C-alpha cells in the first residue's frame, strides 16, 4: 500500500502539471463566480513556470541535497562490499523488446559501481532493485544490469543482485537480509547525490551501520551556470519535490533515521 500511495503522490508532485491544476481550479472558480480566486490561480499558473525556471531557486534546493555528503576519500581500512542502488536503468519493456539493456540519465550509479569493483575486486558488488514502476513491464532492473554485464563480459561470482525491492527503504531492508552485514563492517553505498540523504536515512533506519556514502550523478555544479532555464528548472524542481517529500514521508513513517541526513564527523 505504501508503494502504491507513494507512486500516486508522485503524479501530484510533477511540476509540469502544477499550472494545469491551477487552471482547473480557475475554471471551477469561474463557474462558482469566485473572481478573486480565479484571477489568483491564473496568475500563479503563468508565474509558477517562471519561478521554477529561476535556477537559483530551483537548482538551489537540489544543490542543498547534493551537498549533504561529500565524495569520500577511501582510506586503507578494509571494505566489505559495494552496494549500487537501482534507478539507473531505462525502460524494462524497451530493453526486452529490443534485446538491449537500457540505461537512463543516472547511469553514473552503474559506472561508479563497476569502477569501485575494479578497485575492490575481492569484495561483493551488489546491484539492488527490481523496479520502481507501479505497473512493471519487461525486464527487471536486475535483469537489465545482468544482461549489460554479460555483454561486457563482466559476469563474476562476486557480483550479486538484490532482485525484489521497489523503493529506497526496501533496498535497505532487502540488501541487509541478503548480505547479513556484521557490526563494524564497511559498505560503500552508491546512488545519485540528491538521493543520498534519503538513502542513508533508510539504511540507518533498517539497521545498517558503517555505510560509506559515495554520491554520483550530480545535477548541479558548485555555482549556477546561468540564471534562467525552463528545462533545467523543471528538471531540478522534479527532483526537489520528489526527494524532500520522500524525506518527510520516510521520517514520519519510521523509514528514515533523520529528516535530512548529512555527513557525520568521524
Task: Go through each PLM region and give its residues.
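Hydrophobic alpha-helical segments of integral membrane proteins
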Residues: 1-9, 57, 61-65, 241-248
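A structural signal for short, hydrophobic/glycine-enriched beta-strand patches
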Residues: 51-234
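Membrane-interface helix-boundary motifs at transmembrane edges
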Residues: 30-39
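Hydrophobic membrane-insertion alpha-helices, especially the h-region
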Residues: 40-54
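Membrane-embedded alpha-helical segments of integral membrane proteins
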Residues: 1-30
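Extracytoplasmic/luminal low-complexity segments enriched in Pro/Gly and acidic/polar residues
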Residues: 218, 224-228, 233-266
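Transmembrane helix-loop junctions in multipass membrane proteins, especially transporters and channels
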Residues: 35, 64-71, 254-262
Amino acid at each position: 500500500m505504501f508503494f502504491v500511495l507513494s507512486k500516486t503522490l508522485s503524479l501530484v508532485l510533477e511540476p509540469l502539471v502544477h499550472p494545469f491544476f491551477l487552471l482547473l481550479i480557475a475554471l471551477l472558480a469561474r463557474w462558482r463566480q469566485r473572481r478573486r480566486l480565479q484571477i489568483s490561480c491564473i496568475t500563479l499558473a503563468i508565474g509558477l513556470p517562471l519561478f521554477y525556471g529561476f535556477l537559483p531557486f530551483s537548482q538551489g534546493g537540489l544543490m542543498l541535497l547534493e551537498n549533504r555528503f561529500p565524495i569520500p576519500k577511501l582510506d586503507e581500512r578494509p571494505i566489505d562490499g559495494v552496494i549500487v542502488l537501482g534507478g539507473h536503468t531505462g525502460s524494462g519493456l524497451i530493453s526486452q523488446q529490443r534485446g538491449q539493456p537500457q540505461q537512463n540519465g543516472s547511469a553514473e550509479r552503474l559506472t561508479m559501481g563497476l569502477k569501485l569493483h575494479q578497485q575492490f575486486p575481492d569484495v561483493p558488488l551488489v546491484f539492488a532493485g527490481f523496479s520502481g514502476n507501479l505497473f512493471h513491464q519487461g525486464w527487471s532492473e536486475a535483469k537489465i544490469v545482468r544482461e549489460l554485464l554479460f555483454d561486457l563480459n563482466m559476469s563474476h561470482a562476486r557480483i550479486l543482485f538484490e532482485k525484489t525491492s521497489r523503493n529506497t527503504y526496501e533496498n535497505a531492508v532487502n540488501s541487509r537480509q541478503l548480505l547479513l552485514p556484521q557490526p563494524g563492517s564497511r559498505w560503500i553505498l552508491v546512488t545519485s547525490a540528491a538521493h543520498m540523504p534519503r538513502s542513508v536515512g533508510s539504511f540507518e533506519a533498517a539497521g545498517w551501520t558503517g555505510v560509506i556514502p559515495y554520491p554520483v550523478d550530480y545535477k548541479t555544479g558548485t555555482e549556477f551556470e546561468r540564471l534562467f532555464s525552463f528545462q533545467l528548472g523543471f528538471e531540478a524542481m522534479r527532483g526537489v519535490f520528489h526527494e524532500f517529500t520522500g524525506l518527510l514521508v520516510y521520517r514520519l513513517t519510521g523509514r528514515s533515521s533523520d529528516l535530512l541526513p548529512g555527513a557525520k564527523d568521524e
